[in-house]
Amino acid sequence: MTPARKAGNDPQEWLNRAKSNLVRAKEDIRLSGVFLEDLCFDAQQAAEKAIKAVLIRRNIQFPYVHDLMALLALIEKEGESLPEPVKQAGRLTRFAVVTRYPGLEEPVTREEYERAVIIAEAVVQWAGKQVKKSKRQKRR
């Protein structure tokens, strides 16, 4: 069932979209004819949208880019130390553009795909906690 849609500046909506991308990255592996590059793109998108949910929750302006390290740097600039698994998100940036086009890079391996999903899961989980924590702090 499709979740209800909210405003584009709602961090929960961004988190919902991140979770949707993560589901596709994990579940579509079972479909025949699906390229690992496309699944890795979904993993990258899950991480990107999750990070942007945190940025929105904290009222941090951000550019609409796919560079996950640049986005995470905005959070670190505010004094937040990032857990090591979240810092690994930068490895996903290449899946946002280059690997989606045939012949620009070697095909993605199964190991790269599995690592991408693990990283995306860590980022989405971390972002969910950050968004929830920020909600509680705002209520005080």
Show where each model-derived region lies.
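Terminal alpha-helical segments
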Residues: 1-140
